[in-house]
Amino acid sequence: VNQLLQTRYPDIYALGDCVEVEGKVLPFVMPIIHAARALGLTLGNKPTQVHYPAMPVLVKTPACPIIVSIPNPNTKGEWQIEENKDSIKALFQDTEKNLLGYALLGLATAERAALTARLPPVMQ
């Protein structure tokens, strides 16, 4: 579908965890929430494109919390990994040191908000 969540057929829209928007499949709750808000406005005669901010995914494991924000697969960059006995922090940065993704485990998950603020949006 396009960013208005329109299929190629007039008046048919798509919403849910299996929707591909402009080539991106984001099968998680937060993208659905953003899409539902945009689609509601569109169906109310106010055409609104869906925009996705950076949306890290929380992997719910009680023994070891994990938060991941994967970089675009076509992006060039390097992972920088720091680890200690209670945590792992992996940052994916481009050649100019712009943060494009991360993985946090254990105590490093406390850095989620600060790191997410530095990420680019998934779709503008």
Give residue ranges: language-model regions.
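A short, polar/charged loop-to-alpha-helix boundary motif
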Residues: 108-122
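Mid-to-C-terminal Rossmann-like scaffold of FAD/NAD(P)H-dependent oxidoreductases
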Residues: 18-111
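Short FAD-binding loop at a beta-strand-to-alpha-helix junction that anchors the flavin cofactor
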Residues: 3-26
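Short, intrinsically disordered/low-complexity patches at protein termini
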Residues: 32, 123-124
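A Rossmann-like FAD-binding core segment of flavoenzymes
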Residues: 1-3, 95
